[in-house]
C-alpha cells in the first residue's frame, strides 16, 4: 500500500510533468495567427516557439548616433531656445537634431544627434553659445533610447511583421544598443524599414455648410522642432511644437478661416462623435487619424490677433505623460530622434539567418541534447551498475527538461541557442546533484531503515542547496541585465535550478528511499 503522505513529492513531480506535457501539446494553448509575441515560428507538433536562430530572420544590433551634455544650465521654459541656438552653431543641423530636455528647474541635458559631432566639438559649441555643462559624453539619454524603442515597435507593428521585437540591450562595459529582431524578413528590408520616415499632416476638422470637412493646415516639413513629452504644472502633460516661420502665417490664417481660432477656444470631442464636435486639430499619420485636439482660449486669441506668427510655438495638451509620448512619436511619423548607427564602426551589426539554416540549427540542437542525455546516462550506469539507482536518476533529470519546455511553451518564450544551452546545463547540473544524493546515501553501506536514509539525505540536500544558491546568485546579473542572448541562458538555468531543488531532487530522494528500503 502506497503511503501518499510520505510520497507526496513524487506525486507533485508527476502532476507538474503532466501539466508541462499539457502546455507542450495542448491545442488550446497554441498561439493564434494574430499573436504578436516575440515569436518567429511555432512547432507544428508542439506549442514550442522558436527564436530567430532556430527559425530564420534578421537581427539588427546598433548603437544610436549622438553626444550628450549633462547638467547644462538652462530653465525649462528656454529649452526650445537652447535647441535653436545650438543647432545654428552646427553645420547641417536643424532644431530637430538637437534635444534639450529639462531635468531640474535650472539644469537639463542637451543631445546632438548629428553624425560627426564629437564630445569636444559639443563642449566648444556650448561654451561659444553661453552654456556650461558638467560632462559631455558619447551616446544619448535613456529617455531617447526608450523613445526610439517605442517608435521602432510602432513601425514594425504597422508594417504587419508579426513576431518582430525591439529592445534595448546593455553590454558588460556599459554600452547601449538597440536590438531589433524581425522574423522571415531579409536584412535589406529590415534596414530600410527601421530607417525610413513616414508621412504626417495636421488637419483642421470643422463644419462647413452643415457638413464636416478636413483641411490640411500643416505639412511634415512645416515643423521646425517637435519637443519631448513634458508634465504640465497644473496636471496633465503636453508636447511643445515649433512651426517654421515660412509656414507660420499660413497656419495662423487657416485656423481663423476654419473657425478653430474662435473666441474662447474649442473643445474637441472627435474621438466620441466626429459629426457633432467643435472644430478640432487632427494628427494624421500615414493616412490614419491618431490624435485629436481642441484649442486653448489663449492660443486662439493670439492666432486671431495675428501675434502668434511672431513666435510660432504651441502645445498639444494630453491627459498624461504616456499619451503625450505617443503624440510625440506620432508627430515624428516614425522618424527617430536619434539615428541607428548601421555602419558597424561602433559595434552596429546586421545578421540574417535563412529558414533552412534555422532548421539545421534545430536539428543540431536536438542532436546535442540527445548526445548529452546518452553521455550522462552512460557515465551514471558505469558509476553505479545498479538500475535501481541509475534509471530513476536519468528519468528525473529528463523530467526537469520536460518541465522547462512546458514552461517555455506555456508563456510563449521563444527558444534560441542560448536557451538550448541552458537546458543542456540543467541536465548536467541536475544529474550532478542526483549523484551527490546517491553517493551520500549509499557511501556508508546499506540503508537499513527510513530514519537512516533521511539522515543521509538531509546531509546531501544541504550541499545541493548551497550549490543551487551559488548558481542563482552567479546567474542573477545575467538574467536581470539586458545582455541579449545571455539573458535567456541565465533565466532557464536559474529556473532549472529552482525546479530541481523544489521538485525533482526531493522526488528522487523519495524514489531512492523506496527502492533502497523497500518501503513506499
Curated annotation (Swiss-Prot):
- Provide GO CC annotations from the record: plasma membrane
Kindly provide the name given to this protein in its UniProt entry: Protein-export membrane protein SecD
Q: Which residues cross the membrane?
A: 10-30, 364-384, 391-411, 417-437, 461-481, 483-503
Q: How does it sit in the membrane?
A: Multi-pass membrane protein
User: In which broad location class does this protein mainly occur, judging by the first location in its UniProt entry?
Assistant: membrane
PANTHER family linked to this entry = PROTEIN TRANSLOCASE SUBUNIT SECD, PROTEIN-EXPORT MEMBRANE PROTEIN SEC
- Describe its partners and assembly state: Part of the protein translocation apparatus. Forms a complex with SecF.
Q: Which domain of life is it from?
A: Archaea
Cellular localisation: Cell membrane
Which Pfam families is this protein grouped with? SecD_SecF_C
Q: What does this protein do?
A: Involved in protein export.
Q: Which species is the source of this protein?
A: Haloquadratum walsbyi (strain DSM 16790 / HBSQ001)
Instruction: State the UniProt keywords alphabetically.
Output: Cell membrane, Membrane, Protein transport, Translocation, Transmembrane, Transmembrane helix, Transport
Annotated disulfide bonds:
none
Instruction: From the UniProt record, give one GO term of the biological process aspect.
Output: intracellular protein transmembrane transport
InterPro entries noted in UniProt = SecD/SecF_arch_bac, SecD_arc, SecD_SecF_C
| The UniProt record lists the keyword Transmembrane helix | yes
Q: Which family does it belong to?
A: Belongs to the SecD/SecF family. SecD subfamily.
Amino acid at each position: 500500500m502506497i503511503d501518499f503522505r510520505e510520497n507526496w513529492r513524487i506525486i507533485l513531480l508527476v502532476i507538474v510533468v503532466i501539466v508541462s506535457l499539457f502546455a507542450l501539446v495542448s491545442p488550446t494553448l497554441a498561439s493564434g495567427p494574430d499573436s504578436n509575441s516575440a515569436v518567429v515560428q511555432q512547432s507544428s507538433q508542439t506549442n514550442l516557439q522558436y527564436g530567430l536562430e532556430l527559425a530564420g530572420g534578421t537581427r539588427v544590433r546598433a548603437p544610436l548616433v549622438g553626444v550628450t551634455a549633462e547638467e547644462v544650465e538652462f530653465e525649462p521654459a528656454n529649452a526650445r531656445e537652447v535647441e535653436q541656438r545650438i543647432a545654428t552653431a552646427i553645420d547641417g543641423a536643424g532644431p530637430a537634431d538637437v534635444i534639450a530636455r529639462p531635468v531640474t528647474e535650472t539644469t537639463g541635458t542637451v543631445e546632438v544627434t548629428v553624425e560627426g559631432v564629437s564630445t569636444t566639438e559639443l563642449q566648444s559649441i556650448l561654451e561659444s553659445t553661453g552654456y556650461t555643462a558638467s560632462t559631455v559624453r558619447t551616446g544619448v539619454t535613456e529617455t531617447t533610447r526608450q523613445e526610439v524603442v517605442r517608435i521602432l515597435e510602432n513601425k514594425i507593428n504597422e508594417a504587419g511583421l508579426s513576431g518582430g521585437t525591439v529592445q534595448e540591450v546593455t553590454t558588460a562595459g556599459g554600452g547601449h544598443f538597440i536590438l531589433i529582431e524581425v522574423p522571415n524578413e531579409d536584412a535589406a528590408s529590415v534596414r530600410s524599414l527601421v530607417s525610413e520616415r513616414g508621412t504626417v499632416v495636421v488637419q483642421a476638422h470643422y463644419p462647413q455648410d452643415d457638413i464636416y470637412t478636413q483641411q490640411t493646415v500643416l505639412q511634415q516639413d512645416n515643423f521646425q522642432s517637435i519637443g519631448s513629452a513634458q508634465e504640465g504644472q497644473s496636471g496633465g502633460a503636453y508636447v511643445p511644437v515649433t512651426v517654421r516661420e515660412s509656414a507660420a502665417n499660413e497656419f495662423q490664417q487657416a485656423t481663423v478661416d476654419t473657425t478653430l481660432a474662435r473666441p474662447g477656444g474649442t473643445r474637441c470631442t472627435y474621438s466620441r462623435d466626429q459629426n457633432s464636435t467643435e472644430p478640432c486639430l487632427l494628427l494624421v499619420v500615414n493616412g490614419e487619424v491618431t490624435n485629436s485636439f481642441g484649442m486653448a482660449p489663449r492660443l486662439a486669441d493670439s492666432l486671431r490677433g495675428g501675434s502668434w506668427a511672431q513666435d510660432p510655438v504651441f502645445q498639444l495638451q494630453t491627459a498624461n505623460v504616456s499619451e503625450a509620448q505617443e503624440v510625440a512619436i506620432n508627430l515624428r511619423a516614425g522618424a527617430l530622434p536619434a539615428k541607428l548607427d548601421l555602419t558597424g564602426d561602433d559595434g552596429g551589426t546586421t545578421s540574417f539567418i535563412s529558414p533552412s539554416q534555422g532548421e539545421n540549427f534545430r536539428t543540431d540542437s536536438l542532436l546535442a541534447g540527445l548526445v548529452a542525455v546518452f553521455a550522462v546516462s552512460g557515465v551514471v550506469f558505469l558509476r553505479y551498475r545498479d538500475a535501481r539507482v541509475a534509471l530513476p536518476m536519468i528519468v528525473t533529470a529528463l523530467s526537469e527538461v520536460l518541465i522547462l519546455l512546458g514552461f517555455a511553451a506555456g508563456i510563449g518564450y521563444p527558444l534560441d541557442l542560448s536557451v538550448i544551452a541552458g537546458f543542456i546545463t540543467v541536465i548536467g547540473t541536475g544529474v550532478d546533484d542526483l549523484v551527490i544524493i546517491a553517493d551520500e546515501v549509499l557511501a556508508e553501506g546499506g540503508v537499513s531503515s527510513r530514519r537512516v536514509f533521511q539522515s543521509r539525505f538531509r546531509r546531501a540536500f544541504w550541499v545541493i542547496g548551497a550549490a543551487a544558491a551559488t548558481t542563482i546568485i552567479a546567474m542573477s546579473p545575467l538574467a536581470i541585465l539586458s545582455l541579449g542572448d545571455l539573458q535567456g541562458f541565465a533565466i532557464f538555468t536559474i529556473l532549472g535550478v529552482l525546479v530541481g531543488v523544489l521538485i525533482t531532487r526531493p522526488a528522487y530522494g523519495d524514489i531512492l528511499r523506496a527502492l533502497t528500503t523497500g518501503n513506499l
